Amino acid sequence: KSLTAKYPKVKALDARGQYVMPGGICAHTHFYGAFARGMSIPGPAPKDFPEILQKLWWPLDRSLDAEAIRYSALVSLVDAIKHGTTTLIDHHASPNCIDGSLDVIADAVDKSGLRGVLCYEVTDRDGLEKANSGINENVRFLKRLSASPHPRLAGTFGLHASLTLSGITLQACRAAAPEGTGFHIHTAEHESDEYDSVSKSEMRVVD
């Protein structure tokens, strides 16, 4: 009653005894993963996470074009709306459609009315040229938002995982990132990530 007295012009809804809660926040997702729902992996079942990457996720992200990126984002955003999630961090990858890919996703987020933090996941798995393209896409999008801020969009700098990133590429990302930029990265998703990190640096992934 105190709220209705304080805001007499605001429309009141009968929640019928249910709770009203703030919107949920998804701190990590891959919109393009919408295409993986119900998808079976050809051949024998993957024995571990690296095989899941090689047999499912990497063939999937290599198949994406601008239209597929747009529709996978829209499907994921509709799903978020239905489940009360209002803010999402999307970790995007489309090795054969890198340039401008974050703009396609940003347009979908804008149309949805939700909030999004977007980045492109840089990786060495597709070669140096595409790693550099991923770096450039992150920087371009961050500069776009800096020059023309959006009330519901933000950017961060995406990295796949330390096991698919060389020290040289990591240094290039750090050098390219605008001052104050945060990084979004997979960490310790499987033992192989830990072993790779220890062999490269004698430190675990999060050390």
Describe the role of every protein-language-model region.
Residues 43-101, 161-169:
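Divalent metal-binding segments
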Residues 1-21:
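Histidine-rich, glycine-flanked metal-binding segment
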